[in-house]
A protein has these predicted regions:
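Intrinsically disordered, low-complexity protein-interaction/activation regions
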Residues: 2-134, 138-143, 147-148, 165, ...
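Residues within the DNA-recognition helix of helix-turn-helix
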Residues: 21, 152, 169
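Boundary/linker segments of alpha-helical solenoid repeat arrays
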Residues: 85-91, 147-148, 175-188
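TPR/TPR-like (Sel1-like) alpha-helical repeat modules
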Residues: 158-183
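Interdomain "pre-motor" coupling segment immediately N-terminal to P-loop NTPase/helicase cores
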Residues: 179-210
Length: 220
């Protein structure tokens, strides 16, 4: 803790700062029965196992995300991600701690992506298309090049016969992938795109044929 927060202070000053702040925390976080959040000894600082509390970070870390099949439970976990880790926290001359914050943010963002991916998969498999599309839109803001997500979105649009939307989305995804990553979509995704592009062409031809039939002049 000293190396994170008071690395440039003298040893005596750093230890004093640590003792004072631990005392402040112990005094502030006390249950009705007198139990404090922290147990502090000469050599150890740890969380009191008898102290009852809820912590969003702990809940996110302890969840076995890949094994959760409850959409409601995953939605609850998603609701725990509120802003960045130590958001709006500015600490001067604490480079080690700032590096730790960045690492934790990266870790938590990856956990958030796992939650999104599980929700997308489960809502898709349960034909909850509106929810699935909503989760995909949010997920694409932090994971814009994921072809598995693009494939699910296209399959939903195909299922809805939304050929025009499917073509527009595929073209956007293709352009973004080529521009930002320098790669084309996988052969599987390109093959899938042929389905809705062919269907869109057929729909256009049918509309033209219908227009021609409707505009044939009547015989005298």
């Amino acid at each position: 803790i000293i190396s994170y927060l008071w690395s440039e202070s003298s040893d005596d000053a750093a230890k004093y700062n640590l003792r004072f702040n631990l005392w402040q925390i112990k005094k502030a976080l006390v249950q009705a029965d007198g139990e404090s959040l922290l147990l502090v000894s000469k050599d150890v600082i740890k969380v009191n196992p008898n102290f009852s509390f809820l912590c969003d970070i702990s809940e996110i870390e302890q969840a076995t995300l890949e094994d959760i099949n409850s959409i409601a439970e995953l939605k609850h976990l998603l609701s725990l991600f509120r802003g960045d880790f130590f958001e709006n926290c500015s600490l001067h001359n604490c480079e080690n701690f700032l590096e730790y914050i960045i690492q934790r943010r990266y870790y938590l963002e990856n956990r958030k992506l796992v939650v999104y991916h599980r929700l997308i998969r489960l809502t898709y498999e349960n034909a909850l298309d509106d929810d699935c599309l909503q989760f995909m839109s949010a997920c694409e803001e932090i994971d814009p090049y994921n072809e598995d997500i693009a494939k699910i979105r296209l399959e939903i649009l195909i299922r809805r016969s939304a050929w025009r939307d499917a073509v527009q989305y595929y073209q956007m995804f293709y352009s973004r992938l080529l521009r930002d990553v320098g790669a084309e979509p996988s052969p599987e995704l390109q093959e899938l795109s042929k389905q809705f592009r062919l269907q869109k062409t057929r729909d256009v031809e049918e509309n033209v044929l219908h227009l021609e039939v409707c505009t044939v002049p009547s015989l005298p």
